[in-house]
Regions:
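A short helix->loop->beta-strand "cap" motif at the edges of active sites that frequently abuts
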Residues: 25-30, 53-54, 74-75, 137-139
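Alpha-helix C-terminal capping/helix-to-coil transition sites in glycosyltransferase folds
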Residues: 2-3, 52, 172-173
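Short N-terminal targeting/anchoring amphipathic segment
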Residues: 2-14
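Short, charged/polar "capping" segments at the starts of alpha-helices
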Residues: 16, 40-42, 63-68, 119-121, ...
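A nucleotide-sugar donor-handling region in carbohydrate enzymes
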Residues: 34-42, 49-114
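Short loop/helix-cap segments at secondary-structure boundaries that form the rim of catalytic
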Residues: 48-51, 66-74, 148-158, 189
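Donor-nucleotide binding loops and adjacent catalytic segments primarily
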Residues: 92-176
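A donor-sugar binding/catalytic signature common to diverse glycosyltransferases
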Residues: 9, 164-192
């Protein structure tokens, strides 16, 4: 039997089954890395979920909004910088990915990443995006394919597929990006 000493949940809202599993397990530490904050005046703050945790870590957002996280709770609350999966030292040169994918150094390069496609069908959105970008002869499109999703059926003379993780290590190669507004992608694009 596995007997963990620490449980860490990284997400927006804890699932009921998970909460039921950790409820009453006083022998383990319970940490919630709660991305996103509750807006001031929010009426749907999951107090019953918060009460299951000893520590709540709240990564700050790039845009500071008025928030009201001062609810009386028993958990310790810590703020930290936005969580990203690469550092400046990890970034490859502008030429690295362009050479690897056969993209001219003087081309405009757009990075497209619209999610894993596990929740929403993204293939048609990606097809439309790639078709629109193809109208510009000086633009190459690099589609970031999720490690979690199925392979995309996208091709074209100036289209490249990048299936790697984290793709943010290649951000110096791109001139602009079209991305899904997820926490990780947003903060990595803003940072790099």
């Amino acid at each position: 039997i596995h007997n963990p000493s620490l449980f860490v949940y990284d997400g927006t809202y804890p699932y009921r089954g998970m909460l039921n599993t950790i409820k009453g397990r006083d022998e383990i530490g319970k940490i919630w890395v709660r991305r996103g904050t509750f807006r001031k005046g929010a009426t749907r703050i999951p107090m019953d979920s918060i009460e299951h945790f000893d520590v709540i870590i709240t990564p700050r957002d790039s845009l500071e909004e008025a928030k009201d996280d001062t609810q009386e709770i028993k958990a310790q609350v810590f703020d930290c910088e936005p969580i990203i999966y690469a550092s400046e030292d990890d970034l490859n040169s502008r030429q690295h990915l362009r050479s690897r994918l056969g993209i001219p150094m003087d081309a405009l390069v757009c990075y497209v990443q619209l999610g894993a496609g596990n929740i929403n069908d993204i293939e048609s959105d990606i097809s439309i995006t790639v078709s629109e970008l193809a109208k510009y002869e000086d633009v190459y499109t690099v589609v970031g394919e999720s490690m979690l999703g199925q392979s995309l059926e996208i091709s074209g003379p100036r289209v490249r597929i990048l299936k790697d993780y984290p793709n943010s290590v290649y951000f110096r190669s791109f001139d602009f990006a079209i991305i899904a507004g997820g926490y990780n992608s947003y903060h990595e694009v803003i940072r790099f």
